Amino acid sequence: MVIFLMASFSVLSLAQLPNHLREYPLADRKASGDLVAPIFNGWTPNADGSVTMLFGFANRNRKEIVDIPLGPNNFIEPAQFDGAQPTHFPVYNRGGFIGINERGAFAVTVPADMAGTEVVWTIKNAGYEYSVPGRATSTTYEMSDGERALGTLAPAIRFERDGPESTSREGIRADRVTTSVGNPVTLSAYIQDRGNRADYPEQSKLLFYPLTTDWVMHQGPVAPDFERSLVLDIDREAEGVTQLGAEDWIHVETRATFSEPGSYIIRLRVSNFAAPDSRFDNMCCWSNAYVPVTVTQ
């Protein structure tokens, strides 16, 4: 009798749920036609009283790469923050549920005179609609850009050897690059591990660790073909590329070939997850930079 009542209650409870919630989260992931969810990763206070909010996403499809243009199906409110978000949502599989997440894909800064403002990102796709509010109200979501336990810091990125530097998820933007359909264009940057590990010689084998670089389309009509878009830290180490001092910079590049004209933004993500006090998920340990590209016919 108890089992029957529990089963009946479960069926009734399920029947009361909206259709899109009956499948989630216990249903298997689909190859295609599944949801893309916006995710609020956390916030960082700034010295001037402003707040930087970090967002990522999860594409639950096992195979389908989803593109959602900016507009009624992919927007941020208040409108002044709209446009920073990605339109291209690759499939990630880094193990476990959290492994499908792409964390810290972009960030927005809420000025001090807008303190308390919620920044809401909405995505509509495949019959699903999800909105996530970014709030700087809970210390649970507050993040630090300070050193990790053994001195690791977010890597540095520059587009010119002596140019502006990114050490954050909000990142910097390169000068716009122009190319044409089918004509490969070189995208390049300088990267550096900023770790301060001299005080931890017994725990940290190296003062500076090889970095991982990943070039990915952030916005655009169709993803370009990249020549070696992802270079892992272990690949870089095997090639003999190491950093011996705090002044050393590594030049990295890829070649991108676009098949359709339009306006694009390419994101470069640089991470130092090889360090012993760093791992994927740690917001400390990667930085973003963005390259706007115009592709003509």
Language-model segments: which ranges?
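Sec/Tat signal peptide C-region and signal peptidase I cleavage site
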Residues: 11-15
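Bacterial N-terminal signal peptides
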Residues: 2-10
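Aromatic sugar-binding surface patches on proteins
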Residues: 94-107, 246-252
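Short, acidic Gly/Pro/Ser/Thr-rich loop/turn segments
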Residues: 62
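Acidic, aromatic-enriched beta-alpha/helix-loop junctions
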Residues: 66-103
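Helix-rich interaction surfaces within compact, conserved domain-sized segments
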Residues: 103-126
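Short, well-ordered beta-strand segments enriched in hydrophobic/aromatic residues
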Residues: 51-57
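Extracellular/lumenal mature domains of secreted and surface-exposed proteins
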Residues: 17-24, 30-46, 57-59, 67-72, ...
